[in-house]
Protein backbone atom coordinates (compact mmCIF):
# COMPACT_ATOMS: atom_id res chain seq x y z
CA UNK A 1 0.00 0.00 0.00
CA UNK A 2 2.84 2.36 0.89
CA UNK A 3 4.47 1.58 -2.47
CA UNK A 4 1.24 2.36 -4.34
CA UNK A 5 0.88 5.64 -2.43
CA UNK A 6 4.46 6.58 -3.31
CA UNK A 7 3.84 5.89 -7.00
CA UNK A 8 0.63 7.96 -6.95
CA UNK A 9 2.43 10.81 -5.19
CA UNK A 10 5.16 10.72 -7.83
CA UNK A 11 2.59 10.79 -10.63
CA UNK A 12 0.79 13.76 -9.04
CA UNK A 13 4.12 15.56 -8.66
CA UNK A 14 4.94 14.92 -12.32
CA UNK A 15 1.53 16.22 -13.42
CA UNK A 16 1.80 19.37 -11.29
CA UNK A 17 5.32 20.15 -12.46
CA UNK A 18 4.11 21.10 -15.93
CA UNK A 19 4.30 24.87 -16.04
CA UNK A 20 5.95 27.78 -17.80
CA UNK A 21 9.46 28.77 -16.82
CA UNK A 22 9.98 32.52 -17.11
CA UNK A 23 13.32 34.20 -17.76
CA UNK A 24 13.76 37.96 -17.92
CA UNK A 25 16.35 40.32 -19.32
CA UNK A 26 16.40 44.10 -19.13
CA UNK A 27 14.18 44.31 -22.20
CA UNK A 28 12.51 40.91 -22.65
CA UNK A 29 10.22 38.40 -20.98
CA UNK A 30 10.94 34.83 -22.07
CA UNK A 31 8.42 32.01 -21.57
CA UNK A 32 9.55 28.36 -21.79
CA UNK A 33 6.46 26.11 -21.82
CA UNK A 34 6.92 22.56 -20.52
CA UNK A 35 4.91 20.57 -23.06
CA UNK A 36 4.45 17.24 -24.81
CA UNK A 37 2.49 18.50 -27.83
CA UNK A 38 2.04 21.67 -29.89
CA UNK A 39 -0.86 22.45 -32.22
CA UNK A 40 -2.20 25.37 -34.22
CA UNK A 41 -5.73 25.77 -32.88
CA UNK A 42 -8.01 27.52 -35.38
CA UNK A 43 -11.43 29.10 -35.06
CA UNK A 44 -11.76 29.40 -31.29
CA UNK A 45 -9.10 30.20 -28.72
CA UNK A 46 -8.46 27.41 -26.20
CA UNK A 47 -10.48 28.01 -23.04
CA UNK A 48 -8.80 28.57 -19.69
CA UNK A 49 -10.85 25.63 -18.38
CA UNK A 50 -8.84 23.25 -20.60
CA UNK A 51 -6.45 21.87 -18.00
CA UNK A 52 -4.11 20.33 -20.58
CA UNK A 53 -3.23 23.70 -22.14
CA UNK A 54 0.03 25.21 -20.89
CA UNK A 55 0.41 28.30 -23.11
CA UNK A 56 -1.44 29.79 -26.09
CA UNK A 57 -1.11 32.99 -28.11
CA UNK A 58 -1.94 34.32 -31.57
CA UNK A 59 0.34 32.96 -34.31
CA UNK A 60 -0.31 33.76 -38.01
CA UNK A 61 -1.78 36.98 -39.38
CA UNK A 62 -5.54 37.26 -39.89
CA UNK A 63 -6.72 38.79 -43.18
CA UNK A 64 -10.15 40.37 -42.72
CA UNK A 65 -12.24 41.18 -39.65
CA UNK A 66 -14.97 38.59 -40.12
CA UNK A 67 -17.77 37.45 -37.83
CA UNK A 68 -17.32 33.85 -38.94
CA UNK A 69 -14.19 31.70 -39.14
CA UNK A 70 -12.66 30.31 -42.30
CA UNK A 71 -9.17 28.95 -42.91
CA UNK A 72 -8.81 31.14 -46.00
CA UNK A 73 -8.70 34.14 -43.66
CA UNK A 74 -5.38 32.94 -42.17
CA UNK A 75 -2.19 34.17 -43.83
CA UNK A 76 -0.76 31.40 -46.04
CA UNK A 77 -1.21 27.65 -45.81
CA UNK A 78 -1.05 26.16 -42.33
CA UNK A 79 -1.20 22.80 -40.58
CA UNK A 80 -3.79 22.13 -37.86
CA UNK A 81 -3.97 18.82 -36.00
CA UNK A 82 -1.99 17.09 -38.73
CA UNK A 83 -4.01 18.48 -41.66
CA UNK A 84 -2.85 21.04 -44.24
CA UNK A 85 -5.27 23.96 -44.63
CA UNK A 86 -5.31 26.57 -47.38
CA UNK A 87 -4.90 30.23 -46.37
CA UNK A 88 -4.66 33.46 -48.33
CA UNK A 89 -1.35 34.42 -49.94
CA UNK A 90 0.59 36.89 -47.80
CA UNK A 91 3.65 38.65 -49.23
CA UNK A 92 4.71 39.89 -45.80
CA UNK A 93 5.41 36.35 -44.63
CA UNK A 94 9.01 35.28 -45.18
CA UNK A 95 9.29 32.18 -43.02
CA UNK A 96 7.51 29.33 -41.31
CA UNK A 97 7.54 26.83 -38.46
CA UNK A 98 6.41 23.21 -38.17
CA UNK A 99 6.28 20.74 -35.26
CA UNK A 100 5.58 17.04 -35.03
CA UNK A 101 6.50 14.12 -32.76
CA UNK A 102 8.84 16.21 -30.64
CA UNK A 103 10.73 17.68 -33.60
CA UNK A 104 10.46 21.16 -35.08
CA UNK A 105 11.84 23.24 -37.88
CA UNK A 106 12.13 26.96 -38.63
CA UNK A 107 12.47 27.71 -42.34
CA UNK A 108 12.17 30.18 -45.16
CA UNK A 109 8.64 30.46 -46.52
CA UNK A 110 9.78 28.88 -49.79
CA UNK A 111 10.61 25.72 -47.83
CA UNK A 112 7.26 25.46 -46.01
CA UNK A 113 5.81 21.99 -46.78
CA UNK A 114 3.08 21.60 -49.38
CA UNK A 115 1.55 18.71 -47.41
CA UNK A 116 1.44 17.86 -43.70
CA UNK A 117 3.73 14.83 -44.15
CA UNK A 118 3.66 13.88 -40.47
CA UNK A 119 3.89 17.41 -39.09
CA UNK A 120 1.22 18.02 -36.45
CA UNK A 121 1.12 21.80 -36.85
CA UNK A 122 2.68 24.65 -38.77
CA UNK A 123 2.18 28.23 -39.92
CA UNK A 124 3.89 31.02 -41.84
CA UNK A 125 5.00 34.37 -40.49
CA UNK A 126 7.72 36.99 -40.73
CA UNK A 127 11.12 35.33 -40.25
CA UNK A 128 13.20 37.50 -37.91
CA UNK A 129 16.31 35.40 -37.25
CA UNK A 130 17.33 32.16 -38.98
CA UNK A 131 20.33 30.08 -37.92
CA UNK A 132 21.58 33.02 -35.86
CA UNK A 133 21.47 35.46 -38.77
CA UNK A 134 19.15 38.47 -38.77
CA UNK A 135 16.86 38.59 -41.79
CA UNK A 136 16.39 41.86 -43.74
CA UNK A 137 14.08 44.39 -42.07
CA UNK A 138 11.63 46.27 -44.27
CA UNK A 139 11.79 50.06 -44.10
CA UNK A 140 8.09 50.35 -43.12
CA UNK A 141 8.51 47.85 -40.29
CA UNK A 142 11.76 49.21 -38.89
CA UNK A 143 10.32 52.07 -36.82
CA UNK A 144 6.90 50.53 -36.17
CA UNK A 145 6.18 50.57 -32.43
CA UNK A 146 4.27 48.05 -30.29
CA UNK A 147 4.89 45.31 -27.76
CA UNK A 148 6.43 42.56 -29.87
CA UNK A 149 6.33 38.78 -29.52
CA UNK A 150 8.15 35.95 -31.30
CA UNK A 151 8.42 32.17 -31.29
CA UNK A 152 12.10 31.38 -30.78
CA UNK A 153 14.61 28.60 -30.33
CA UNK A 154 17.14 29.29 -27.59
CA UNK A 155 19.76 26.75 -26.50
CA UNK A 156 17.78 23.91 -28.08
CA UNK A 157 14.47 24.87 -26.45
CA UNK A 158 11.35 26.51 -27.84
CA UNK A 159 10.23 29.70 -26.14
CA UNK A 160 7.95 32.70 -26.56
CA UNK A 161 9.87 35.97 -26.29
CA UNK A 162 8.08 39.25 -25.68
CA UNK A 163 9.26 42.83 -25.27
CA UNK A 164 8.56 44.29 -21.83
CA UNK A 165 7.22 47.55 -23.25
CA UNK A 166 6.34 49.34 -26.48
CA UNK A 167 9.48 49.52 -28.63
CA UNK A 168 10.43 49.76 -32.30
CA UNK A 169 10.63 46.57 -34.34
CA UNK A 170 14.27 47.39 -35.05
CA UNK A 171 15.03 47.38 -31.32
CA UNK A 172 13.12 44.12 -30.79
CA UNK A 173 15.25 42.42 -33.44
CA UNK A 174 18.39 43.76 -31.75
CA UNK A 175 17.28 42.47 -28.34
CA UNK A 176 16.58 39.02 -29.81
CA UNK A 177 19.99 39.02 -31.44
CA UNK A 178 21.66 40.05 -28.17
CA UNK A 179 19.74 37.27 -26.39
CA UNK A 180 21.36 34.88 -28.87
CA UNK A 181 18.31 33.03 -30.13
CA UNK A 182 19.04 30.65 -33.00
CA UNK A 183 15.68 31.18 -34.70
CA UNK A 184 12.90 33.74 -34.29
CA UNK A 185 9.53 33.88 -36.05
CA UNK A 186 7.16 36.81 -35.54
CA UNK A 187 3.85 36.24 -33.75
CA UNK A 188 0.84 38.46 -34.47
CA UNK A 189 0.54 41.36 -32.02
CA UNK A 190 -1.28 44.65 -31.53
CA UNK A 191 -4.32 45.57 -29.43
CA UNK A 192 -6.45 42.45 -28.99
CA UNK A 193 -4.13 40.30 -31.07
CA UNK A 194 -1.70 40.26 -28.13
CA UNK A 195 -4.28 38.51 -25.91
CA UNK A 196 -2.73 35.29 -24.58
CA UNK A 197 -2.70 33.14 -21.49
CA UNK A 198 -0.62 30.47 -19.82
CA UNK A 199 -0.90 28.13 -16.86
CA UNK A 200 1.64 28.33 -14.05
CA UNK A 201 1.39 25.84 -11.19
CA UNK A 202 -2.27 25.34 -11.98
CA UNK A 203 -3.11 29.05 -12.07
CA UNK A 204 -4.12 30.86 -15.26
CA UNK A 205 -2.13 33.99 -16.07
CA UNK A 206 -3.61 36.28 -18.74
CA UNK A 207 -1.33 38.37 -20.94
CA UNK A 208 -3.27 41.43 -22.16
CA UNK A 209 -7.07 41.64 -22.26
CA UNK A 210 -9.30 40.29 -24.98
CA UNK A 211 -10.81 43.20 -26.93
CA UNK A 212 -12.40 41.53 -29.98
CA UNK A 213 -13.35 38.20 -31.57
CA UNK A 214 -11.47 38.54 -34.85
CA UNK A 215 -8.44 36.41 -33.96
CA UNK A 216 -8.34 33.16 -35.93
CA UNK A 217 -5.44 30.97 -34.83
CA UNK A 218 -3.29 30.24 -31.79
CA UNK A 219 -0.06 28.34 -31.28
CA UNK A 220 -0.94 26.12 -28.33
CA UNK A 221 1.34 24.12 -26.06
CA UNK A 222 -0.18 21.11 -24.28
CA UNK A 223 0.92 18.99 -21.31
Where are these regions (language model features)?
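Gly/Ser/Thr/Pro-rich low-complexity, intrinsically disordered segments
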Residues: 18-223
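Sec-dependent N-terminal signal peptides
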Residues: 4-15
Amino acid sequence: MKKVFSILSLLILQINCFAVTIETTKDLNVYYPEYSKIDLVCGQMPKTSQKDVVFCCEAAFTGELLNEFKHLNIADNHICNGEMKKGYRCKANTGGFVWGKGKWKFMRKADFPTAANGWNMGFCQLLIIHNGETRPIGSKMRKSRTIYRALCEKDGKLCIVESKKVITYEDFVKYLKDFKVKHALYLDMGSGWNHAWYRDNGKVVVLYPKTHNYCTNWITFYK
